[in-house]
Each structure stands twice: as structure tokens, then as C-alpha cells.
Amino acid sequence: MYSRQLASCVALALVLLANSAPTSSPAKEAQQYLEQLLLDLQQLLRGINNYKNPKLPMLLTFKFYMPRKATELKHLQCLEEELGPLHDVLNLVQSKNLYLEDAGNFISNIRVTVMKLKGSENTLNCEFDDETVTVVEFLSRWITFCQSAISTMTQ
């Protein structure tokens, strides 16, 4: 239970230490934030997908919107817009599910990291797909987005 919190704290501490270094370039900084975002999204997905999660069938009934096209960091605005509904859904099962008890912390971390990556501007109007996705698909697609962005930055 505390190992997830410790891992999250260690990862955040490493990001903060790395970001305080004067030699850090903006691209390297963005990559580090993306790596932190990736970790937080993966932790949420692990908690939801846990084979002992009795609430998974209920969680899969809630639907989320994905952007039509998410290829740039500015598209993280679309993720941010769905964090409120995601938080609400996870709160429904959090009290009785030990695997999701840190969901609020992960959502807060994701919100802060997204703000750092996309900036404070809310100029992008998200164009969402007409079809909705489950919470598992939602997190999986954003994980793929982060992995793709990190891969692009390291080339």
C-alpha cells in the first residue's frame, strides 16, 4: 500500500531534482514531466485492472471522451477536461477498494503535470470522438500518447 506512495514520491523527487538543475533543457524537462505523467496513469490503470478489483464491472459502465486527434502536448487539455469525471468515478469505488485509495493523489499529480506540460493557456477547444470509451481504454490511450511523445523526444 505504501510502496505505491513511496514510488510516486521518489519519482516526483527525481523529477524535481532534475528540473532544478540549471543544465536542463526545455525538451528534457518536458520528457521528465511526460515520464511522471506516464507513471501516474499506469498506476491508476494497475489499480483498476487489479484482478482482485470487485468493482471493475461497475467501473467499465462509465464512459469517457477521447479527442479525435491527440498528437501534441497541447492536446493534454483534453485529458485535463476528463480528469474531473475520472476523479468522480474513482471516488465511487475508492472507499471500498484498497487498490484505488491513492486515486485522488494520482489525479492531483496528473493535473499538475499536465499544467506544466501544456502551460496555463486554455486556447485549445477539444474535439472529442463521438464514441466514448471505458476507463481502461481511456487510461490506456493516454498511456500510449505519453509513450509516443517520449519516444519522439528521444529520437
From Swiss-Prot:
Predominant localisation class: secreted
Gene3D superfamilies listed in its UniProt record: 1.20.1250.10
Any one GO molecular-function label of the UniProt entry: growth factor activity
Keyword Signal: yes
Keyword Ribosomal protein among UniProt keywords: no
Signal peptide region: 1-20
Compartments reported by the entry: Secreted
UniProt keyword annotations, A-Z: Adaptive immunity, Cytokine, Disulfide bond, Glycoprotein, Growth factor, Immunity, Secreted, Signal
Domain of life of the native organism: Eukaryota
Pfam families assigned: IL2
Function: Cytokine produced by activated CD4-positive helper T-cells and to a lesser extend activated CD8-positive T-cells and natural killer (NK) cells that plays pivotal roles in the immune response and tolerance. Binds to a receptor complex composed of either the high-affinity trimeric IL-2R (IL2RA/CD25, IL2RB/CD122 and IL2RG/CD132) or the low-affinity dimeric IL-2R (IL2RB and IL2RG). Interaction with the receptor leads to oligomerization and conformation changes in the IL-2R subunits resulting in downstream signaling starting with phosphorylation of JAK1 and JAK3.
Family that this chain belongs to: Belongs to the IL-2 family.
Name of this chain's protein: Interleukin-2
Species annotation: Meriones unguiculatus
Gene responsible for this protein: IL2
